[in-house]
A protein has these predicted regions:
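Canonical tetratricopeptide repeat
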Residues: 29, 63, 97, 131, ...
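Canonical positions in the second alpha-helix
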Residues: 49-50, 83-84, 117-118, 151-153, ...
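Eukaryotic alpha-helical solenoid repeat scaffolds
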Residues: 309, 325-502, 556-577
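Structural marker of alpha-solenoid helical repeat scaffolds
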Residues: 53, 87, 121, 155-156, ...
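Helix-start (N-cap) detector for alpha-helical repeat units in TPR-like alpha-solenoids
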Residues: 23-25, 58-59, 92-93, 126-127, ...
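Register position in tetratricopeptide repeats
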Residues: 36-37, 70, 104, 138-139, ...
Length: 672
């Protein structure tokens, strides 16, 4: 839940060099644009320019650190955050970000200190508190963690069900099973749509050996969310206890579909297949498991047992020797190895191992004054997901958030969640002009535009453009290429100020480097020179949309997801901006009524404005022009579902899947 927060600096200035002085405010803003759209390499280049021009600006170091965090360059981020704090010791978010970095680097005490400092400067900031929760958790300071959790819950109450789930987990870690159950039971009653709540209560029931109740809870959790491998693993354990091996194996196989190298699922499945006599399948799982983790000695021990049964005594001896090397007082390993040596007629080695096993057992009986587990004892029973050491890993237990994409500092929440439904979805993005296409998203024969084809034919020596709905972040080389293009085209414009194509191509280059102000200006110049260019109007609308997303994000808590939530059409703060871009779409459609991308993009905007009937009408118009427009079917399907017309929505999703948007099938499955 630790989200990045980007401060916005919106000042209308140019990116160009003026009288030898870099306009740093504009560079900061464009760098923030790049951050917002996940172009972290590009963002770093902008912040580098600011730092080179004005090394005393602490925000540039801080924002560059954010970009480095998103690229998992934690040491580089730490250096930048140290510099930012050195220049200004009163920026709470710098301490918050550095705390996050310290957690990633394993310096948990320093992380705790930084989160506490951030809270001194901003005492009730929930994000900072959540950061400190993580630091406490990683240090096993569960009492302190519980105190912070209670503070958040008093402050935010029912708005934080995931934090309430965390409370149940921490209570469980503190050994208060009854309190943990009460907490989880309360959440299930108040937030029955949360799979994590049902899974949490199921785990506690399971640990309390209330197996029927646990099974019932896991059934609900899995019906609400079908992609949690741990839920399937634990339900498989419950099925196994009921001797329903078929159901147990089915659940474990499903867990492995979701998490291919899940060690618990592989181990547990090997135990069941061994028990029913399918030694080869059990051995295959154990081979995979040892390949993943050669230090999982329970797997080696189980593999040795199976190898013996299959007559592979040398393989058994190899595994048992590894175990004995690690656990020299584990008597069963000596006994088993003695059997294999005996089968290979190595009587001396067999006798030696058997004597060692007898001596260890004798000493163990003499010194057995406690029921505590011996250090050299392997747990060869089925594993319960998140019940032992894994219970302290918050990311895997109960799933703190129903949105998997939001547990990293540099990741943003999914777009367009359908509210009050148990399906995590995002609509397909708008189409934009780009020289870079991802083949799975764009099929040229289906996505034909006469205007774009003419443009590409006329300018074969320039970059070829495509309509795409999935943009790629730029590499260093591509960033340099587009800046060079901007310089070259600027020289052409200086020589000929009346060339429509030069402004159009420079605008596209500005868009690619996230310089939206200059892009809008150039698209506007292109429109002045050729008012019949539907492409220029549509491109200007898209740049205005991107600017608006960043502006909304800045004004609503600095989160990207907030910028993509539905907004009221009457919101005066942004109504003029929406009006401008809708006007551009309408003009593009008026010039080229066959430009189905413009209908689709406008439909996405109308959906944002909660005018769902208008959105459906526009998606329908786009589909009328292009019967193979998968993205339009997909988004129209989501809109129908939101309006409660599930049958129509599923039909559209089915068509989208047929046309290649395979995520539609997963969504259909969840809706059933």
């Amino acid at each position: 839940m630790m989200k990045k927060t980007i401060l916005s600096l919106f000042v209308a200035v140019n990116i160009t060099l003026v009288c030898g002085q870099v306009n740093t405010e504009h560079l900061m803003r464009v760098g923030n644009n790049a951050m917002y759209f996940n172009d972290y390499v590009l963002a770093i280049q902008y912040f580098n320019k600011v730092i080179n021009a004005k090394p005393y600006i602490e925000q540039a170091y801080m924002y560059r650190a954010f970009a480095k965090i998103s690229l998992e360059d934690y040491n580089g981020a730490l250096d930048d955050l140290d510099r930012a704090i050195e220049k200004n010791q009163f920026i709470p978010h710098a301490y918050y970000a550095r705390g996050y970095v310290y957690n990633r680097l394993g310096e948990y005490a320093k992380a705790e200190s930084d989160f506490s400092k951030a809270l001194e400067l901003s005492p009730e900031n929930t994000s900072y508190l959540i950061g400190r929760l993580e630091a406490y958790d990683l240090q096993k300071k569960y009492t302190e963690e519980l105190a912070d959790i209670d503070f958040i819950l008093r402050k935010n109450g029912s708005k934080e069900p995931q934090i309430a789930i965390e409370k149940g987990r921490v209570q469980l870690l503190l050994g208060d099973t009854v309190a943990a159950f009460r907490t989880m039971d309360s959440i299930v009653g108040r937030h029955s749509y949360l799979a994590a709540a049902w899974g949490g209560r199921a785990l506690i029931n399971m640990l309390m050996e209330k197996n029927d109740s646990a099974l019932a809870d896991y059934n609900v959790a899995i019906s609400l969310r079908t992609d949690n491998a741990e839920h399937y693993i634990n339900r498989a354990n419950l099925f196994y206890k009921k001797h329903n091996y078929r159901a147990a194996l089915s659940d474990l196989s499903k867990a492995l579909e979701l998490s291919h190298n899940n060690k618990m699922a592989l181990f547990n499945r090997s135990l069941i297949t061994f028990e029913i006599g399918d030694y080869n399948k059990a051995l295959a799982d154990l081979n995979q498991l040892v390949k993943i983790d050669g230090k999982m000695y329970e797997a080696r021990y189980q593999r040795a047992i199976i190898s013996q049964k299959l007559g592979r005594h040398r393989e058994a001896i190899a595994d048992l020797s590894k175990i004995i090397e690690r656990y020299p007082n584990f008597a069963p390993a000596y006994s088993l190895r003695a059997e294999s040596y005996n089968k290979l007629q190595n009587n001396k080695a067999s006798y030696r191992d058997m004597q060692t096993a007898i001596q260890i057992e004798s000493k163990r009986r003499q010194h057995k004054k406690t029921s505590a587990k011996d250090d050299d004892e392997l747990n060869n029973e089925a594993k319960i997901a998140n019940s032992e050491s894994g219970v302290s890993d918050w990311a895997k237990l109960f799933e703190m958030t129903e949105d998997k994409g939001d547990d990293k500092f540099g990741k943003n929440s999914v777009r367009g969640n359908i509210q009050n439904r148990q399906v995590d979805v995002k609509p397909q993005d708008n189409f934009v002009l780009s020289p870079y296409r991802i083949n799975k998203n764009v099929e040229p024969e289906h996505y034909f535009s006469a205007q774009l084809n003419r443009l590409n034919d006329l300018h074969k020596n320039d970059m070829r453009l495509y309509f795409v709905c999935s943009e790629i972040p730029l590499t260093d080389a591509l960033v340099a290429y587009h800046f060079k293009n901007i310089d070259l085209i600027s020289e052409k414009i200086a020589a000929d100020k009346d060339n429509y194509y030069n402004y159009l191509y420079r605008a596209i280059n500005y868009t690619l480097v996230q310089d939206f102000d200059n892009a809008v200006n150039d698209f506007s110049e292109a429109i002045k020179l050729d008012g019949g260019s539907a492409l220029a109007y549509m491109c200007r609308a898209e740049v205005r949309r991107k600017k608006l997303e960043v502006a909304i994000s800045s004004g609503s808590g600095n989160t990207k997801s907030a910028a993509q939530e539905p907004v009221e059409a009457t919101d005066k703060k942004f109504s003029h901006d929406f009006e401008l871009l809708i006007r551009d779409y309408d003009t593009a459609i008026g010039i080229d009524p066959e430009l189905f991308f413009a209908y689709y993009n406008k439909a996405n905007i109308m959906s944002r404005l909660q005018d769902y009937n208008a959105a459906i009408a526009l998606y329908t118009q786009a589909i009328g022009i292009n019967k193979k427009f998968a993205e339009a079917y997909y988004n129209r399907g989501l809109t129908y579902i939101y309006l409660g017309e599930t049958q129509k929505g599923v039909a559209d999703l089915s068509k989208a899947g047929e046309l290649g948007l395979y995520e539609a099938y997963n969504l259909i499955k969840k809706l059933r």
